[in-house]
């Protein structure tokens, strides 16, 4: 397989910057239990990010990562949540992430409009980034990415004409949440 073909299947390119590395560390720690720095280094290497133990230790310190006991009683790394909640918490399970997205959609979603593969969501002032974070963490396969301002989110559908179906889905979630 050529280098170009390998890159096609490798997923999105990850820049080798400190900020990108920090973002990837937070993503990993929020998605799965990580018990050691060596395990985290392996997971980063799997994503094409090679780091030394000293760099990883410094990164974890800069991210205010701590070890906490998860629901199974294991000590795992955790980072403070983004937004107002600064206390590190055990990562939410998939159903909890989806439920959080449903609940926040019901509370915050004012409207959803689509065009081609784009969806524009409106929220009350100051709430767009909060809802975008919940949508990102729910990891819906149909969503390629989100961009949030103060009261507006832009969602990008993976499908070229998937915007309307995605808008309808989010509106249904907001209306059907109990």
Swiss-Prot record:
An annotated GO BP: L-arginine biosynthetic process
MF-aspect GO terms: arginine binding; DNA binding; DNA-binding transcription factor activity
Protein name: Arginine repressor
Coiled-coil segments: none
InterPro entries cross-referenced by the UniProt entry: Arg_repress, Arg_repress_C, Arg_repress_C_sf, Arg_repress_DNA-bd, WH-like_DNA-bd_sf, WH_DNA-bd_sf
Function: Regulates arginine biosynthesis genes.
PANTHER family recorded: ARGININE REPRESSOR (PTHR34471:SF1)
Alphabetical list of HAMAP family matching this protein: Arg_repressor (MF_00173)
Pfam families in alphabetical order: Arg_repressor, Arg_repressor_C
Family: Belongs to the ArgR family.
Compartments, as annotated in UniProt: Cytoplasm
Pathway noted in the entry: Amino-acid biosynthesis; L-arginine biosynthesis [regulation]
Region listing for Disordered, in residue ranges: 1-21
Keywords carried by this UniProt record: Amino-acid biosynthesis, Arginine biosynthesis, Cytoplasm, DNA-binding, Repressor, Transcription, Transcription regulation
SUPFAM superfamilies linked: C-terminal domain of arginine repressor, Winged helix' DNA-binding domain
GO cellular component, one term: cytoplasm
């Amino acid at each position: 397989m050529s280098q170009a073909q390998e890159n096609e299947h490798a997923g999105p390119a990850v820049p080798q910057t400190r900020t990108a590395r920090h973002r990837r560390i937070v993503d990993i720690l929020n998605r799965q239990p990580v018990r050691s720095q060596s395990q985290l280094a392996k997971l980063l290497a799997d994503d094409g990010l090679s780091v030394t133990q000293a760099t990883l230790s410094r990164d974890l310190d800069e991210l205010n990562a701590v070890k906490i006991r998860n629901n199974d009683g294991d000590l795992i790394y955790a980072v403070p949540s983004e937004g107002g909640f600064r206390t590190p918490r055990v990562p939410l399970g998939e159903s909890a992430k989806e439920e959080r997205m449903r609940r926040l959609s019901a509370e915050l979603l004012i409207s959803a409009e689509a065009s081609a593969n784009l969806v524009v969501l409106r929220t009350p002032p100051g709430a767009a980034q909060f809802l975008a974070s919940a949508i990102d963490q729910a990891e819906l396969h149909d969503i390629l990415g989100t961009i949030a301002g103060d009261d507006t989110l832009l969602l990008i559908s993976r499908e070229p004409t998937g915007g309307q179906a995605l808008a309808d889905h989010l509106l249904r979630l907001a209306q059907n949440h109990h």
